[in-house]
Regions:
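Membrane-interfacial helix-loop segments of redox and metal-homeostasis proteins
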Residues: 42, 84-243
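Thioredoxin-like thiol-disulfide oxidoreductase module
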Residues: 28-46, 70-75
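Structural alpha/beta surface segment adjacent to cysteine/selenocysteine redox centers
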Residues: 24, 37-48, 52-62
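Non-catalytic, surface beta->alpha helical segment in thiol-disulfide oxidoreductase systems
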Residues: 53-79
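Local sequence-structure signature of Cys/Sec-based thiol-disulfide redox active-site neighborhoods
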Residues: 1-30
């Protein structure tokens, strides 16, 4: 479909995939609503684009992906791809910060920056769609189920704790008392909620940790996020006491 003001992205992706697989493609553009309606009627389909290989009707972009053996996520399928992408990015971000600000690479310093930046990025993910996040969060968080506004406050609390920890790493400032308890509180409540939902009640849920309408399974990843928040708060308080 190539109409004024709209160029079909699925058509472009199908075309690119076919070319990458070595096919010579005869790309027939549908440029008017009349052409689109006539094509759908002639081939008894509801959507465009449609791909034909060797005279055989393969289907739309999703069917083309399946044809070439790519995984296509169904409505109820889960994946760890979003969380792997986030943690890989925040690990590299933390590494860049440590190499730039410190004379040597120390594991403790790296982990602090990694945990703090991960909290910030995960909070940003949630803030992209707060309503969607809350809908998923209410499925398992024990405090949010009793007091719904907590669900709306959670992403902001996580962002606050993450930014606060980033600002105070290595300072030994008493201001850590304004930040660490927030991380400890929401992390502890979250960890208990995940343990109950997944490991006690044996429920199969998706995790709201990367935002609304996530297809990341609830379990170890969400538990890790909450333990990191609580642990980071305790860690920074222990450093303050020792200083």
């Amino acid at each position: 479909m190539a109409m004024p003001g709209h160029l079909c992205p699925f058509g472009l992706k199908s075309l690119s995939m076919l070319k990458l697989k070595g096919y010579e493609v005869n790309d027939n553009l549908l440029e008017t609503r009349e052409e689109i309606d006539a094509f759908k009627k002639a081939h008894n389909v509801n959507t465009t684009p449609q791909t034909f290989i060797g005279g055989e009707h393969v289907g739309g972009y999703t069917e083309v992906k399946k044809h070439f053996g790519y995984r296509v996520l169904g409505k109820d399928d889960t994946t760890y791809t979003p969380i792997v992408a986030i943690f890989t990015s925040t690990a590299l971000m933390a590494l860049a910060i440590v190499l730039n600000l410190y004379d040597e690479l120390q594991l403790q310093t790296f982990l602090m920056w990694f945990f703090a930046t991960s909290m910030v990025v995960l909070a940003i993910q949630k803030l992209q769609n707060v309503e969607g996040f809350v809908n998923g969060f209410l499925g398992y968080d024990l405090l949010a189920q009793r007091y719904v506004p907590y669900g709306y406050a959670y992403p902001f609390a996580e962002l606050y704790a993450g930014f606060g920890m980033m600002a105070l790493i290595g300072t030994g400032s008493v201001l850590i008392w304004l930040v660490a308890p927030v991380g400890i509180f929401i992390g502890t409540v979250g960890a208990v909620s995940v343990i109950k939902a997944v490991y006690i009640d044996k429920r199969e849920l998706t995790c709201a940790c990367v935002g609304g309408e996530s297809n990341v399974p609830l379990g170890f990843i969400s538990l890790s996020e909450n333990l990191i928040m609580a642990g980071m708060g305790i860690w920074m308080l222990s450093i303050w006491f020792a200083s």
